[in-house]
Amino acid sequence: MVMNPLKNLFLILTFCLSVFGFAQEKQKITIEYAGIAASDPEIEDGALVFLRDESQQVHFIHKGVNMWCDKAIYYEDQDYIEAFSNVNMKQGDSINMVAKYVEYSGKTELAFAQGDVILTEPQSVLTTDKLYFDRTRQLAYYNTNGEVVRDSSGTITSQIGRYYMNAKKYQFTKDVVLVNPDYTLNTDRLDFFPDNGHAYLYGPSTIVGETSEVYCERGFYDTNNDIGYFQRNAKIDYESRTVEGDSLFFDRNRSFASATNNITVTDTINNSIVRGHYAEVWRDKDSLFITKRALAITVQEKDSVYLHADTLMVTGKEDNRITRAFYNARLYKSDLAGKADSIHVNHQTGLTQFINLDRFSSTDAFAIARKPVLWNLDNQMTGDTIHLISDVKTEKLDSLKVFNNAFLVSKDTISEDGYNQIKGQRLIGLFRENELYNVDIIKNAETIRYMRNDKNELIGIQKSKSGSINIQIVEKAIDEVRFINQIDGNIFPESEFPKSGRRLRGFDWRGEERPISVEDFFKDDPPLILPKIKGLEDYIPPEEFTNEDLEKRIEEAGKATPKKINKAARNVPKKSTSKPSKHKLMPFDASKKQ
């Protein structure tokens, strides 16, 4: 480059007068300061070269943008500038961009920055190697990988990114990763608002922390407060417990999650599954609350156990877990069923308690129907409280205890209205291979029994009283009865035994209540009405950076110099060849799902 110091002043004055003359026609780039100005015959189109001096950098201004650099080449006829070395571009008080090299067109208001590009706004810092900045749309764009840092949120990286300055919104696509000290977020597409730290996730997404992992295909996450809302195949993994549902809420700070509609909670250690339509999970407390057709399933090798109630609560660590079923609780497995107001299961000891609430007094006519009841094979057992003990290792039934008002009933195999009945204060039963084989009725024992011979012919009806009774059961039928401290007893011909006396006091056959399948649990439940979940807003694919408006501005910029290469068309990103995403979220109508 040939510099003629005598021409410097003349060139600057000429440049300023030229700009002033066009100012009324269309505002062009203006020079605010240059240490040295010269022409260079090696530069095409007779462009002017501006250099800094020892006091300050070259300074240009255009429509509210200030730009400083060490060297600038200005193509006056195309109102186009190239800035080199320590370039700083500032828009207003909020946007600042630095780079090694910047091109800027005063006609299209498009800037291209390259080399250690850093764009700063009040809440975040964007770093990339190449950045396009359309001032007309107030849109910055990169497609060669970029990084955005927001102190309280973390660092976001992606292959492609946009920053909408008016909306104060980032839009990231392809290999999007948000790294925070407490978690890492991966997603296909992410909309991020630096002012409030709100992030919107689109497509398969994960948020992985030390103690939890979230998956969804549509979600919202507040990076300021560490709370989130997730939909579309959403699930949360808490180490040994997984929560799935139509809609999930997540609070990292409280280790809390809630789920709405079509919920499944899986315990991988205890091989259990809990289902319902509203749930709350407290990880640190190892607590699960679930309601709306709540169903707990304990998966066993040969036969699963099902527990249903209005409300289920599961508490305790994996090795000391307790399941509580409240309000109209029912239990079912292939050879056993039970019903009570409340059922408690201790998974460590194998104790299952069938409990009545205190509000049901013995004088309440409804209390009898609400007494806990247990069915095993053909036997029905009732009492004020029932304890069922299982062997936690073999998963087989071990023993049974009925406290207060114990009553054992089995239907006679032949007569239509005959029932074998045994009652007493307490009952203790023993199981072998999940079948009841020994029963002891303790204190104030009474019995009515239909006696039959080997041909199954009725011999008579036995009625007796004793201190206690021991019963041996073989092949599901009473084989032997032993009366201990018998007080009274006799066998009556059927014709001499009045029907009015064939029921012991407190008799209540409840065979119609016995569930014979899991589906029977829900027959008496009120109609299930699920809330309609409000879907998050649909994903709106970003428009091309090089859109029709920008193309028109570039074309218009070249009309003034038709015989020259249109510099405004330099370094404009090519249009994407990929098709817009087909992912579209419609509002949930959970009422259509059961």
Predicted regions and their residues:
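Bacterial N-terminal signal peptides
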Residues: F10-S18
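Conserved adenosine/adenylate-binding substructure
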Residues: F20-F22
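N-terminal amphipathic/hydrophobic interface segments
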Residues: Q24-Q594
